[in-house]
Amino acid sequence: MNAPERQPQPDGGDAPGHEPGGSPQDELDFSILFDYEYLNPNEEEPNAHKVASPPSGPAYPDDVLDYGLKPYSPLASLSGEPPGRFGEPDRVGPQKFLSAAKPAGASGLSPRIEITPSHELIQAVGPLRMRDAGLLVEQPPLAGVAASPRFTLPVPGFEGYREPLCLSPASSGSSASFISDTFSPYTSPCVSPNNGGPDDLCPQFQNIPAHYSPRTSPIMSPRTSLAEDSCLGRHSPVPRPASRSSSPGAKRRHSCAEALVALPPGASPQRSRSPSPQPSSHVAPQDHGSPAGYPPVAGSAVIMDALNSLATDSPCGIPPKMWKTSPDPSPVSAAPSKAGLPRHIYPAVEFLGPCEQGERRNSAPESILLVPPTWPKPLVPAIPICSIPVTASLPPLEWPLSSQSGSYELRIEVQPKPHHRAHYETEGSRGAVKAPTGGHPVVQLHGYMENKPLGLQIFIGTADERILKPHAFYQVHRITGKTVTTTSYEKIVGNTKVLEIPLEPKNNMRATIDCAGILKLRNADIELRKGETDIGRKNTRVRLVFRVHIPESSGRIVSLQTASNPIECSQRSAHELPMVERQDTDSCLVYGGQQMILTGQNFTSESKVVFTEKTTDGQQIWEMEATVDKDKSQPNMLFVEIPEYRNKHIRTPVKVNFYVINGKRKRSQPQHFTYHPVPAIKTEPTDEYDPTLICSPTHGGLGSQPYYPQHPMVAESPSCLVATMAPCQQFRTGLSSPDARYQQQNPAAVLYQRSKSLSPSLLGYQQPALMAAPLSLADAHRSVLVHAGSQGQSSALLHPSPTNQQASPVIHYSPTNQQLRCGSHQEFQHIMYCENFAPGTTRPGPPPVSQGQRLSPGSYPTVIQQQNATSQRAAKNGPPVSDQKEVLPAGVTIKQEQNLDQTYLDDVNEIIRKEFSGPPARNQT
């Protein structure tokens, strides 16, 4: 099997194992490997050089090696030659790379070409340089071994065993050659499967180690190989050396004998590290005796079976990190067009296992290392957490949720510190987030009465004026250690890392967050992400967001969420940035002008307070600098005058932000502030009155001066209602009791009074009273109806009057107690409420009256407001006049209706209809 062989003689003498005068089919033909046709080999024979054995010594020092050297052009493999050039039967002879083995005992050498480098180059580099230069070797005959046909493999294009744009014509050093023992699935340049003797065609390559060479010559490619890092099927049971040589070579050893079939029992233990392809252990060696260079159809079927078995082998033992993608995945070719040629003979065809095919189809364009998507053993909490059904549709982390729902409330009992130094991925942990008191934040769920624990989710959210969502540049980090008392574990929810801790009923659903740190991601990784518009260096404030899902017995899941105060995570010192800890007010009217006191840290005499307003998409629409009282301000306190809002006619509250700024980039986190619209009170045309006229027994009437505000929504000064009584003359008695019901319809006469000192809640009001005598109206007056808040507030001051006695009731206004009192020059008086009456007109009525009632043809604007039904019934069914007692007057309340500036006459009529449509037997003018 391993017969000793002689080295070639320097003079080109004969060597055993070669036939003299070989035909052209027996010669080495380099026309396929190189781009031009060679001259007659006999003409170049005298210029050939003989190569001595390398000094390092191959594994088989007696092997006869023949070399042929010629630079190889990468375009040769891309020239578009048909596969028949490599495998057509009529051109098998001249197209072979390596001649078949000749019968043992043949004498003489066949003509051959030996183009070798200089002797100095051989001594310096040894066999490595020759292999990288594209050497082709001819196998000498084996002594004592029966002749056996040997089919050969062509050398594929350079892309078959190294990356494109590689400077070296041979396979480059693998980036994983020192990590994994996986084999290259591609065709090696010196592979020739055989079924004869086990001797290698290139034994000197067996000792080339798989380490990088320290030399910078073009021997080694500057790029790593994709082929050598790929996976193949299971390994052959043939043993291999346990250690690698320390020689400064850069290539792996290529087997020239164990390519497609298994070795016979007497095979050499020396094994290639990169057989291409690797056969399965159950493939039997071929025993056909075909003299052709390529195997027949039957032998091809065996090889095809071997390749198919390779495709079904599972690469279970290969580490997952060694799987690598390719920028240009090449599918495995279909069945060859020539039945006698196996698939691996065709050029520019990659052999890919099924696992790698799937990876290359779905891989990104760049070459990356694949890692498992999930941990094989996920971290689980030590105590059970109430699990949510998998089919439940939980809201995503981007959705804003309320912190309270029904009886449940998720509350942060202890807020975190406003500054925490986040740690980078390349450095160690900086501990958990702490509280200002020295401990850690505390979160509690209120209103939960079940006995099952729940899971509290924690993630890092944004802290700007936009809607709260997971932060793009920061993630929560799980802290472990001896001082950590809270059980926690990590999981991924929608590409966001979430930390989940238990909320247990035995702890009153209260948890101390001592296991949550903040991790800073690389800005470049996030900013280059598709759709990301934020800038990492400008987005350094975060919030701790807590979320809990509460399953109910009905199957409904209640989700609550609360967020902490903003936390500054930048590397800048905390002493440089101003920080607002408290503000004494958080809202005012649109006019501003109020003073706001800010308490915090790092305030200077040059500190400014700026109010801003932004839209939901972050666009700033308003900015105004507030006035800071520098005389009162201190390093930890600022006195600020709130600026006027840009729009004074708003109808709903507007939320804005403000911040304290010490310099160009030294600003505090934004604080919230709210501007409220001015409360609107509808004012009707009011009458200015003269108290002397009201107090006089005789008068000529009331002067009226209508007052209209400049803007219905902006009240320059509050207007108050002052109730007054128009003078009424009392007539003789004789009115029957049914007429008393008519008198109940006359409401109280009140007058709007423009005054800043009166409060609407303290205005006097007098309730309608029963009249026992027929009355007539002597003077015209106007009346305005006002709400009667309650029966207690609507009280009447009533005095019985004797027959035929007239009196002039007068309303006295007392500025001390801001109440209206009714007085008279007579001891007894009657108070009557009337509406739109004027002399000169007799009011017809069902009951007989002794004197007509005079009505006024003119109508005055009135505001009719509803009166308490209880007061009306009490006035209707009240006791006789003689039994009524004197009651002290009470204040009148004013009802502020919505959209008073849009009230029209139709609305007033509707109120009137509702007012008088309640009790029956009521007549209205």
Curated annotation (Swiss-Prot):
GO terms for biological process: B cell receptor signaling pathway; calcineurin-NFAT signaling cascade; cartilage development; cell migration; cellular response to calcium ion; DNA damage response; lncRNA transcription; myotube cell development. Residues 184-286 are annotated as: 3 X approximate SP repeats. In resting cells, phosphorylated by NFATC-kinase on at least 18 sites in the 99-363 region. Upon cell stimulation, all these sites except Ser-243 are dephosphorylated by calcineurin. Dephosphorylation induces a conformational change that simultaneously exposes an NLS and masks an NES, which results in nuclear localization. Simultaneously, Ser-53 or Ser-56 is phosphorylated; which is required for full transcriptional activity. Ubiquitinated in endothelial cells by RNF213 downstream of the non-canonical Wnt signaling pathway, leading to its degradation by the proteasome. Induction: Inducibly expressed in T-lymphocytes upon activation of the T-cell receptor (TCR) complex. Induced after co-addition of phorbol 12-myristate 13-acetate (PMA) and ionomycin. The modification Phosphoserine is found at residues 23, 99, 107, 110, 148, 168, 171-172, 174-175, 177, 180, 213, 217, 221, 236, 243, 255, 268, 274, 276, 280, 326, 330, 363, 755, 757, 759, 856, 859. Residues 421-428 bind DNA. Residues 119-199 are annotated as: Transactivation domain A (TAD-A). Its main location: cytoplasm. InterPro entries: Ig-like_fold, Ig_E-set, IPT_dom, NFAT, p53-like_TF_DNA-bd_sf, RHD_dimer, RHD_DNA_bind_dom, RHD_DNA_bind_dom_sf. Coiled coil: none annotated. A motif (Nuclear localization signal) lies at residues 251-253, 664-666. Residues 161-175 are annotated as: Required for cytoplasmic retention of the phosphorylated form. Residues 264-281 have a biased composition (Low complexity). It holds the Pfam family RHD_DNA_bind. SUPFAM superfamilies: E set domains (SSF81296), p53-like transcription factors (SSF49417). Residues 392-574 form the RHD domain. Expressed in thymus, spleen, heart, testis, brain, placenta, muscle and pancreas. Isoform 1 is highly expressed in the small intestine, heart, testis, prostate, thymus, placenta and thyroid. Isoform 3 is highly expressed in stomach, uterus, placenta, trachea and thyroid. Plays a role in the inducible expression of cytokine genes in T-cells, especially in the induction of the IL-2, IL-3, IL-4, TNF-alpha or GM-CSF. Promotes invasive migration through the activation of GPC6 expression and WNT5A signaling pathway. Is involved in the negative regulation of chondrogenesis. Recruited by AKAP5 to ORAI1 pore-forming subunit of CRAC channels in Ca(2+) signaling microdomains where store-operated Ca(2+) influx is coupled to calmodulin and calcineurin signaling and activation of NFAT-dependent transcriptional responses. It is linked to Joint contractures, osteochondromas, and B-cell lymphoma: An autosomal recessive disorder characterized by musculoskeletal and hematopoietic issues. Affected individuals develop painless fixed joint contractures in early childhood, have osteochondromas, osteopenia, and can develop B-cell lymphomas. This is Nuclear factor of activated T-cells, cytoplasmic 2. The gene is NFATC2.
